[in-house]
Amino acid sequence: AYYLRALSNLEKEQPFFQELFGQDVSKYDVTRLKRAYNDFLLISNRFKGSKYANDAENRLVFLRNSMANHEVYIANYYLKRGAFIASSERAKYMLETYPGAPASKEALIILIESYNKLGSTNLAIESAKVLTTNFSNYTYTIDKNDLVVIKDKSVDPVVEESSFFDFGLF
């Protein structure tokens, strides 16, 4: 019964058109995802060894990551609209609530950018240290305006390739 309830909450959150068009469920209300998460967590904890427990644990990972992505989506929304305190609070909440989630990198970058916009250089530096410690392909520097600048070492600078049009033929 718990398993069916969890599946029901999960399926209500993933309608046919969202799956068909590849929409990200984390961009919408996650109330049902949270309910499904709690139901699958109950199954995982209470019914260890059952045929549903393994599936429940796999779905817990998906749901946790979806809810973490939702928090990052909201934090980014606030950041784009200039609500830097709200953005930083949402990113911190994501990092505290879903530690180790794949969206942690994005949350830290949002946190750094929010702190830069708020003029909180020390907090931006602390966040940059966490980012560079956990994601070794990132480095940071402090520019002349006391802003933390993040660089992803894995991204190559854009190299302009010559093309047919470069030879003056067109």
Model-found features: residue ranges?
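Acidic, polar-rich low-complexity tracts and alpha-helical solenoid repeat scaffolds
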Residues: A1-F170
